Amino acid sequence: FMGGLIKAATKALPAAFCAITKKC
């Protein structure tokens, strides 16, 4: 589940995901 959620997040909001997870 988390894997799919991460993929969706990185595709829809790459900048936000980068800032939240600190993984760029």
From Swiss-Prot:
Q: Does the keyword Disulfide bond apply?
A: yes
Quote the tissue specificity entry. Answer: Expressed by the skin glands.
Alphabetical UniProt keywords = Amphibian defense peptide, Antibiotic, Antimicrobial, Disulfide bond, Secreted
Write down any Gene Ontology CC term: extracellular region
Q: Which InterPro entries does the record match to this protein?
A: Antimicrobial_frog_1 (IPR012520)
Indicate where this protein resides in the cell. Answer: Secreted
What is any Pfam family matched here?
Antimicrobial_1
What cystine linkages occur within this chain?
Answer: 18-24
Determine if Secreted is one of this entry's keywords. Answer: yes
What superkingdom heads the lineage?
Eukaryota
What's an example GO BP annotation here?
defense response to bacterium
What is the stated purpose of this protein? Has antibacterial activity against the Gram-positive bacterium S.aureus ATCC 25923 and the Gram-negative bacterium E.coli ATCC 25726.
Protein family:
Belongs to the frog skin active peptide (FSAP) family. Brevinin subfamily.
Q: What is this protein called?
A: Brevinin-1PTb
Q: Which organism is it from?
A: Pulchrana picturata
